[in-house]
């Protein structure tokens, strides 16, 4: 009996679920799971997870104390909600969950450090060790510097919103555990920029970008893992078979599972080792210069941070509205 694409992919790549939907994670049984502000906000609006949201809000209200304002309670609950979802996910998966630092801190190294340490402390208080959590941080220069410090403290990081080789090299030199180079968002940019409707998977600019990063890392023996992220279609995934990890949405996991076809390995450390690649080192000046020269990376990093910021603001509003309703229910029950 022929194997489906998901079964074959698992033989060469660690498959990760890119979702905050706990039921979807139970269905696909991934090794790891990744969340981000948009995914947590989406999950928080699903009726089946209302209990997690309510419990987090009520506990935050209790912990904030009698004189706390609504804004203070929401702020506390907001910080805890991603961890609450992470804890539920960790009950299902054998591996690691990625939990993201507030995207509004992406250009502030110190604030990122404070928030990351707090997230790890919350997981620790719930009995979860550092080996099972990846702290997600945007791949700004400031974010990469924060990750470098956190890694030295034994806190593992997943550097996200990564669109260019300059970001990837800076992450590897900082000794981060894992990077999430985006595929689909790169394709989106090129389609818009060129006016093209589609690219074959072998020419997909996102696929080419991740392939280049993977080959660079393997050629020069970096330990940082490559986890391709943000997929628009099946072809992008199959062209990256062999990547250390791939984080995939439930809808595409379902498509992989229902497709029976041959899946040849595309990314291979042995092949990468034989390539002729120039090694470069990245400091602040070269990072800034390469970033400014890369219109796509500049646009998409900025857009990604703005998008996650909007999701965070939506989540804060959702929590504030829910808190008002919960307080009304408490009053009505007395």
UniProtKB/Swiss-Prot annotation:
GO terms for cellular component: cytoplasm. Gene3D superfamilies: Aldolase class I. It is found in: Cytoplasm. It is an enzyme of class 2 (transferase). Its main location: cytoplasm. It comes from the Bacteria. The active site is at residue 136. InterPro entries: Aldolase_TIM, TAL/FSA, Transaldolase_1, Transaldolase_AS. Pathway: Carbohydrate degradation; pentose phosphate pathway; D-glyceraldehyde 3-phosphate and beta-D-fructose 6-phosphate from D-ribose 5-phosphate and D-xylulose 5-phosphate (non-oxidative stage): step 2/3. It catalyses: D-sedoheptulose 7-phosphate + D-glyceraldehyde 3-phosphate = D-erythrose 4-phosphate + beta-D-fructose 6-phosphate. Keywords: Cytoplasm, Pentose shunt, Schiff base, Transferase. One of its GO terms (molecular function) is transaldolase activity. One of its GO terms (biological process) is carbohydrate metabolic process. Its EC number is 2.2.1.2. Belongs to the transaldolase family. Type 1 subfamily. Transaldolase is important for the balance of metabolites in the pentose-phosphate pathway. Homodimer. This is Transaldolase. It comes from Nostoc punctiforme (strain ATCC 29133 / PCC 73102).
């Amino acid at each position: 009996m022929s194997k489906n694409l998901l079964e074959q992919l698992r033989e060469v790549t660690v498959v990760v679920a890119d979702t905050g939907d706990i039921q979807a994670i139970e269905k696909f049984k991934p090794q790891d799971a990744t969340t981000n502000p948009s995914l947590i906000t989406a999950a928080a609006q699903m009726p089946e997870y209302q209990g997690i949201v309510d419990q987090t809000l009520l506990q935050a209200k209790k912990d904030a104390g009698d004189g706390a304002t609504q804004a203070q309670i929401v702020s506390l609950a907001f910080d805890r909600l991603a961890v609450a979802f992470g804890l539920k996910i960790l009950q299902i998966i054998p591996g690691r969950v990625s939990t993201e630092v507030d995207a509004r801190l992406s250009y502030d190294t110190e604030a990122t450090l404070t928030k990351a340490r707090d997230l790890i402390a919350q997981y620790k208080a719930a009995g979860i060790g550092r080996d099972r959590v990846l702290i997600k941080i945007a791949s700004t220069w400031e974010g990469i510097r924060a990750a470098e410090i956190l890694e030295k403290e034994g806190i593992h990081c997943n550097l996200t919103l990564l669109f260019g080789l300059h970001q990837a090299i800076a992450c590897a030199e900082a000794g981060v555990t894992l990077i999430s180079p985006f595929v689909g968002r790169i394709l989106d940019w090129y389609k818009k920029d060129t006016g093209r409707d589609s690219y074959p998977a072998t020419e997909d600019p996102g696929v080419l970008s991740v392939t280049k990063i993977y080959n660079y890392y393997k050629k020069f023996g970096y330990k940082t893992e490559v986890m391709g992220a943000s997929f628009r279609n099946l072809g992008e995934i199959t062209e990256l078979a062999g990547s250390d990890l791939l984080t995939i949405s439930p809808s595409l996991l379902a498509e992989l599972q229902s497709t029976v076809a041959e899946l040849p390995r595309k990314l291979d450390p042995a092949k990468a080792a034989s390539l002729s690649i120039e090694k470069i080192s990245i400091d602040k000046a070269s990072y800034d210069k390469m970033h400014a020269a890369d219109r796509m990376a500049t646009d998409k990093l900025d857009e990604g941070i703005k998008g996650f910021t909007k999701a965070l603001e939506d989540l804060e509003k959702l929590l504030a509205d829910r808190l008002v309703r919960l307080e009304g229910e408490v009053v009505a029950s007395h």
